[in-house]
Curated annotation (Swiss-Prot):
The gene is gpmA. InterPro entries: His_Pase_superF_clade-1, His_PPase_superfam, PG/BPGM_mutase_AS, Phosphogly_mut1. GO terms for molecular function: phosphoglycerate mutase activity. Substrate binds at residues 8-15, 21-22, 60, 87-90, 98, 114-115, 183-184. It comes from Solidesulfovibrio magneticus (strain ATCC 700980 / DSM 13731 / RS-1) (Desulfovibrio magneticus). This is 2,3-bisphosphoglycerate-dependent phosphoglycerate mutase. It comes from the Bacteria. Its EC number is 5.4.2.11.
Length: 249
């Protein structure tokens, strides 16, 4: 049996401000740092250990992983950073407040932008400063790989080569992986692992800073999965994620 641990980054500054973040590089709030520290405590107390780590190239995930490894006394572990684990690119919505968008366009439209499988948000113009082609960390990406926006379907298409080429071979060889990433890149992995349908994935809400444990068989099929921590607290955090796209009352 293999164990895979997934952790969404701790609360970011734009999570707190309820903005669409996507590939915008924002840091963690004090609460986000505390969430990551608590996640490290849960993993340590649960007896989890790791051989290698994976994260995105966005600061909030990298910072979360650093806090996790500090708490686990494993700062020396090898870390691979990949743009393929980045958050979904929210295109022209990046930086905009979700509740304000719900008030302007309606909660149903914002739900479609946030949670539908194959409907992308408005695309960025390549001249827009938010376009990733203007960021040196993506200098090696081809024009086809640089998103102007992404649906979850697009995010799945980006993440799955990383699963097949990097993650699955490592897990199959016995490597214990710790992955610190983002709500939608993790939803892409969860959709694949649990064979969740295109419509049903809209109900999957991954809370910040809570370890999600997968127990996998020899063929890397899930035997079980569960969150570490108090079940009611985890459910409240997941419900808060679902409510982010509602207009303020």
């Amino acid at each position: 049996m293999h164990t895979l641990v997934l952790v969404r980054h701790g609360q970011s500054v734009w999570n707190l401000e309820n903005r669409f973040t996507g590939w915008t590089d924002v840091g963690l709030t004090p609460q986000g740092r505390e969430e990551a520290a608590q996640a490290a405590n849960l993993l340590r107390d649960g007896g989890y250990d790791f051989d290698a780590c994976l994260t995105s190239v966005l600061s909030r995930a990298v910072m979360t992983l650093d806090i996790l490894l500090t708490g686990l006394d494993r700062l020396w572990l090898p870390v691979t950073k990949s743009w393929r684990l980045n958050e979904r690119h929210y295109g022209g919505l990046q930086g905009l407040n979700k509740a304000e968008m719900a008030a302007q366009y309606g909660e149903e439209q914002v739900f479609v932008w946030r949670r539908s499988y194959d409907t992308p948000p408005p695309a960025l113009d390549p001249a827009d400063e938010r376009f990733p082609g203007r960021d040196r960390r993506y200098a090696t990406l081809t024009d086809a790989e640089l998103p102007r926006c992404e649906s979850l379907k697009d995010t799945v298409a980006r993440v799955m080569p990383f699963w097949h080429d990097v993650m699955a071979p490592a897990i199959a060889s016995g490597t214990r992986l710790l992955v610190a990433a983002h709500g939608n890149s993790l939803r892409a992995l969860v959709k694949y692992l649990d064979a969740i349908g295109d419509d049903a994935i809209s109900e999957c809400n991954i809370p910040t800073g809570v370890p999600l444990i997968y127990k996998l068989d020899a063929s890397l099929k899930p035997l079980e999965h569960f969150y570490l921590g108090d079940a009611e607290a985890v459910a409240r955090k997941a419900a808060a994620v679902a409510a982010q796209g509602k207009a303020k009352g």
